[in-house]
Amino acid sequence: MSPQTETKASVGFKAGVKDYKLTYYTPDYQTKDTDILAAFRVTPQPGVPPEEAGAAVAAESSTGTWTTVWTDGLTSLDRYKGRCYGLEPVPGEENQYIAYVAYPLDLFEEGSVTNMFTSIVGNVFGFKALRALRLEDLRVPPAYSKTFQGPPHGIQVERDKLNKYGRPLLGCTIKPKLGLSAKNYGRAVYECLRGGLDFTKDDENVNSQPFMRWRDRFLFCAEAIYKAQAETGEIKGHYLNATAGTCEEMIKRAVCARELGVPIVMHDYLTGGFTANTSLAHYCRDNGLLLHIHRAMHAVIDRQKNHGMHFRVLAKALRLSGGDHIHAGTVVGKLEGERDITLGFVDLLRDDFIEKDRSRGIYFTQDWVSLPGVLPVASGGIHVWHMPALTEIFGDDSVLQFGGGTLGHPWGNAPGAVANRVALEACVQARNEGRDLAREGNDIIREASKWSPELAAACEVWKEIKFEFAAVDTLDK
C-alpha cells in the first residue's frame, strides 16, 4: 500500500480504546416517543465512575464494542447507538445507581421479544467493569408494541367465552404434581371441576413422562371437563400443558387440544422460550384457544435485588409475546412478592395505560394502546382464610388458584372445591354490599362456614397455616 493510499484510508479513524462515556453518556439527550427506554440498576466495579458504567451498559447493549473499529465510519452512530441519558444514586445503597438508557427503535426486529432481549439483556450482563447489573423496568413505545399480536384473546374475550362475570375465576393445580396415572389424574380434575372450580391445571413439570404420556392425560382431562360441564351447567377448563422439547411437538399437542374441544392450553414461557411462546400464542388466537402461562424459572432471573431482571419486565415481555393468564405471586402465600411491587406489575398486565409510579416500582409511563390485557394468577400456598385478602388485592380480573388448598381438604377433592367456591362467593357478595374485606375478612369467612360444612372443615384445617417471611425484592426507600 502506498503512503498516499494509507493516509486516505486513515482519515477519520484512529485506532485504540476510548472511554465509553465520550460517546454513549449524553445527559442532555431528549428522549423520543419511539425510543425503547430502560432503567438499569448498575453496581460498578471499584474505581469505575458511574458515568462510565452507565455508558458501558448503553454501548454494550447497542452498537459499541471494546475498541474503536474502522467500520464505525460506514454507519451513523448518532442514529443507532444507545444513550445513557440519566443517572441517579439508589437511596440507602452504596455504589448503586439507576442508569436510564434510550434505544432507537430501528435496533430491534418487529414483533420479536427474542431479538429485543438479546440486545438489552445480552452480553452486557457479563461485562467485567460491572459488579452487578439489573434491568428494573422497560418502556415499550406504541410504535413497537403495535408490531406484536399480544395475548391471543384478552380478558374481556375470555369472560365472554366462559360466560363468567363479576368475580375472580377459581382454579386448582392437580397434586401430587408428578406420579399420578392419567386415569387418576382425570378423576381429580373431574372432582375439582364438579365441586365448583372454573379451571384445573397441569403443574409446570407435567409434560409427557413415562408415568403419564401427554395424549393419555389430554383424553382423560377432556372427558372430565365434559362430564363436569354437563352436571353443573357451567363452562369448565383444564390447562393442558403443551410445553415440549421442540416447537413442532408443542404445536402438535395444541392441535390435539383443539380437536378435543377444550377451551385452554398452557405453556412454560421462560423454560420454553419466547420464540416458542409467540408461536403458540399465534396458534391459539387463530384456533380459538385460551393460553395460560406459567413462569417457571423466573426466580432464577428476578429474585436477586442487584442482578438479573425484575419480573415487571418479564411480565411486559409476556404481554407482548402472548398469553391470557400468567402467574403473578400472591402477596399472602408461600411465594415471593411484596404488595406494592406485585400490584404494580399486575396493573402493567391488565391496564391499557399505566402512569409512572416509583412507589410501586414503575419507572416509566406505559401506554399499551389497544393490546389486550392478561389475567394475573395468584397461586402458591393459599387457602380459604386468604380468600378475602386475595379478592381485595387482585379484584375481579384475576384467577385465584388453590392447589393444596383444594386437594388437601380432609373430606376430599370435591368438598375442597366447594369450600373455595363458597368462600369466594361470600367475599364477592360482602364486597358488593360495601363491607371492608381487609378488616372484616375473617368474620365473613366464619359467617359463611356456618351454612357450609365443607368450608367449616377447611377453616379448621388451615387456621394456623401462615407463611411469614420478609420479601427479598423490596422497594428502595
Curated annotation (Swiss-Prot):
Biological process terms in GO annotation: photorespiration; reductive pentose-phosphate cycle
Molecular function per GO: magnesium ion binding; monooxygenase activity; ribulose-bisphosphate carboxylase activity
Keywords assigned by UniProt, alphabetized: Acetylation, Calvin cycle, Carbon dioxide fixation, Chloroplast, Disulfide bond, Lyase, Magnesium, Metal-binding, Methylation, Monooxygenase, Oxidoreductase, Photorespiration, Photosynthesis, Plastid
Catalytic activity: 2 (2R)-3-phosphoglycerate + 2 H(+) = D-ribulose 1,5-bisphosphate + CO2 + H2O; D-ribulose 1,5-bisphosphate + O2 = 2-phosphoglycolate + (2R)-3-phosphoglycerate + 2 H(+)
Principal cellular location given in the protein's record: plastid
UniProt cross-references to PROSITE patterns, sorted A to Z: RUBISCO_LARGE
Cofactor: Mg(2+)
Annotated Mg(2+) binding sites: 201, 203-204
N-acetylproline PTM positions: 3
Modified how: The disulfide bond which can form in the large chain dimeric partners within the hexadecamer appears to be associated with oxidative stress and protein turnover.
Residue numbers bearing the N6,N6,N6-trimethyllysine modification: 14
Entry-annotated residues carrying N6-carboxylysine: 201
Pfam annotation, one family: RuBisCO_large_N
Pro-peptide positions on chain: 1-2
Any further remark recorded for this protein: The basic functional RuBisCO is composed of a large chain homodimer in a 'head-to-tail' conformation. In form I RuBisCO this homodimer is arranged in a barrel-like tetramer with the small subunits forming a tetrameric 'cap' on each end of the 'barrel'.
Similarity-based family: Belongs to the RuBisCO large chain family. Type I subfamily.
PANTHER family attached to this UniProt entry: RIBULOSE BISPHOSPHATE CARBOXYLASE, RIBULOSE BISPHOSPHATE CARBOXYLASE LARGE CHAIN
Subunit structure: Heterohexadecamer of 8 large chains and 8 small chains; disulfide-linked. The disulfide link is formed within the large subunit homodimers.
Protein name: Ribulose bisphosphate carboxylase large chain
Organism encoding this protein: Manihot esculenta
Gene name in the database record: rbcL
